[in-house]
Amino acid sequence: MAKFDVYDLDKKKVGEIELADAVFAGEVNEHLFYEVVKAKLASDRSGTHAVKNRSLVSGGGKKPWKQKHTGRARQGSTRASQWVGGGKAMGPKPRDYSYDVPKKVRKAALRSALALRSQEQKLVIVQEWKPAEPKTSAAAKVLAKLGARKALVVDAAANAALARSVRNLDGSDFLAAEGLNVYDILKHDALVLTAETAKMLEASLS
């Protein structure tokens, strides 16, 4: 078990928490980052690219000139791809770029990402963070005290006030624990977890 300090919002130590080595202090596998992030970015692609082929371009139903005895190359339609205004040959079509990554791989990559932030000393665990109202300036001061600018803040459940406070900061964002993913961890410079969130992640990733 690995021990981590738990802080209040003024960066004063208020206790310690023990978390599984396998989740927060394991081996970092960068290839898993590559696989999971590539899949995430692929699934984000809209895939709506499209062009008109000769069957979709209007007109061109009539043969432009007779087949023989004109001295010109034979043509069947003015909408063939070699004509100006014709359809595109073998152009892009709408497609779905997303593909599945095995659940075990996703979990292993998430464990690696947590271990990486822990090794870099960019993982901060706070006792709790439940603002009464959304206030960006207050969130900015807390992150500055925690030494976690451009941070991803994760709470055990949806926290509307905290989400609105943090998301308005340049380079920072908020996620509920169930939405935590490798891409967002790597995208931000630091990771801030509540103690409850850390225990939830330990249970789900062990």
From Swiss-Prot:
Family classification: Belongs to the universal ribosomal protein uL4 family.
GO biological process, one term: translation
Ranges annotated as biased composition (Basic residues): 63-72
Entry's Gene Ontology molecular function annotations: rRNA binding; structural constituent of ribosome
InterPro entries: Ribosomal_uL4 (IPR002136), Ribosomal_uL4-like (IPR013005), Ribosomal_uL4_dom_sf (IPR023574)
Keywords on record: Ribonucleoprotein, Ribosomal protein, RNA-binding, rRNA-binding
PANTHER family the UniProt entry points to: 50S RIBOSOMAL PROTEIN L4, LARGE RIBOSOMAL SUBUNIT PROTEIN UL4M
Pfam families: Ribosomal_L4
Gene from which this protein is expressed: rplD
Organism name: Anaeromyxobacter sp. (strain Fw109-5)
Function: One of the primary rRNA binding proteins, this protein initially binds near the 5'-end of the 23S rRNA. It is important during the early stages of 50S assembly. It makes multiple contacts with different domains of the 23S rRNA in the assembled 50S subunit and ribosome. Forms part of the polypeptide exit tunnel.
Quaternary context: Part of the 50S ribosomal subunit.
Protein name, entry field: Large ribosomal subunit protein uL4
A cellular component term, taken from the record's GO annotations: ribosome
Keyword Chloroplast: no
Sequence segments annotated as region (Disordered): 48-98
